[in-house]
């Protein structure tokens, strides 16, 4: 359950700076969004995946649906909106693999708790529910509560937010931030080891901090 959008990937030598123009080395456009990427990743590893997301009825939305079908991701619960475009993200990637992202939510921002209630059948037979705070955190929390009600484990990828609701420590079986996200959520904790220790102290059962080019 999460965001599905079109990503514009832009390769640059160095970070953007206010008032300066930098050359783009390469540009590519492809389906993305943390929810979509998780779904496709699991499918490529041989897992059976169904996704709930919100798209616009437009070219970008059709492109995303085609991509998911090609990768054997179930889309029968997708929500299609006539008057709101599909979301779009602009990702600036440096040579060291570090990145910065600007996001237009579009239809992703319309996903709501009622949509989850009407699609609870997605939890039937599921082992894990993959969530990200790229969608509204309140909606993600509601999804996690429903997952728990159906006996489904929750994996949370925090992003975009500066604060995680305290309830996540009870709902998330596995927390997977990258080191920058972890540092933003835990000011003053700069190493993955200290971040993991602090998340554990706050009640999280299993924490995996990813480290960009360092793995």
Question: Would you name each region that the model predicts?
Answer:
Residues 1, 26, 52-57, 75-86, ...:
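Beta-strand->loop->alpha-helix junctions that form or flank phosphate-binding loops
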Residues 59-71, 89-93, 97, 115:
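Active-site-proximal loop->helix
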Residues 144-215:
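Conserved phosphate/ATP/ADP-binding segment of small-molecule kinases
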Residues 40, 88-92, 100, 215:
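Short beta-strand scaffold segments in enzyme catalytic cores
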Residues 54, 76-81, 91-128, 133:
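Conserved phosphate-binding/catalytic loop of the ribokinase/pfkB sugar-kinase fold
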Residues 1-54, 59-73:
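Glycine-rich phosphate/adenosyl-contacting loop at the front of the ribokinase-like
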């Amino acid at each position: 359950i999460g965001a599905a959008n079109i990503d514009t990937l832009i390769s640059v030598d160095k970070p953007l700076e206010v008032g300066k123009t930098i050359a783009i080395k390469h540009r590519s456009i492809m389906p993305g969004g943390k929810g979509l990427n998780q779904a496709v990743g699991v499918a490529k590893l041989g897992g059976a995946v169904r996704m709930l997301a919100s798209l616009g009825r437009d070219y970008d939305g059709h492109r995303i649906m085609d991509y998911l079908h090609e990768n054997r991701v179930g889309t029968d619960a997708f929500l299609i909106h006539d008057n709101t475009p599909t979301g779009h993200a602009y990702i600036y990637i440096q040579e060291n693999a570090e990145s910065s992202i600007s996001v237009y939510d579009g239809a992703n921002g319309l996903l709501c708790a009622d949509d989850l209630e009407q699609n609870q059948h997605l939890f039937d037979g599921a082992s894990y529910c993959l969530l990200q705070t790229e969608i509204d955190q309140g909606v993600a929390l509601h999804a996690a509560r429903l997952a728990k009600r159906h006996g489904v484990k929750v994996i949370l990828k925090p992003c975009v937010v500066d604060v995680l609701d305290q309830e996540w420590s009870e709902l998330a079986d596995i927390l997977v931030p990258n080191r920058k996200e972890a540092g933003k959520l835990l000011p003053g904790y700069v190493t993955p080891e200290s971040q993991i220790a602090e998340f554990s102290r706050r009640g999280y059962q299993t924490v995996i901090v990813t480290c960009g080019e360092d793995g």
